[in-house]
Design a protein with these regions (language model features):
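A generic structural motif
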Residues: 14, 21-24, 58-60, 70
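Hydrophobic, low-charge alpha-helical segments
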Residues: 1-12
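Short aromatic-glycine-enriched beta-strand elements
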Residues: 25-30, 62-65
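Beta-strand/loop nucleic-acid-binding surfaces
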Residues: 36-47
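Conserved positions in beta-strands of structured domains
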Residues: 19-21, 42, 55-57, 67
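Residue "hotspots" at secondary-structure boundaries inside conserved domains
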Residues: 10-11, 22, 46
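Short, compositionally biased
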Residues: 66-73
């Protein structure tokens, strides 16, 4: 039987910074390293503009929950 590695949990992304691809009010795309991720803003955070820095607060499925780095939570 072949070894099937378990993909790493997305929890490793929590706390990482990413950049907004195109500004959005509720959901949109962010770049973390070389990868693009679907993201939703933390309630009460945003809107964000293109190239804003966001921080990953949590994950839900393959969607990241983020807040703008300058927002205070």
């Amino acid at each position: 039987r072949a070894y099937e590695p378990t993909p790493p949990p997305l929890d490793r992304l929590i706390g990482l910074q990413g950049r907004v691809i195109r500004g959005f009010d509720r959901s949109g795309l962010v770049r973390l390293g070389s990868e693009l991720w679907q993201a939703e803003l933390v309630e009460g955070s945003g809107p964000v503009s293109t190239n804003d820095v966001v921080v990953v607060e949590s994950t839900r499925g393959l969607t990241l929950t983020v807040y703008r780095q300058t927002d205070e939570l």
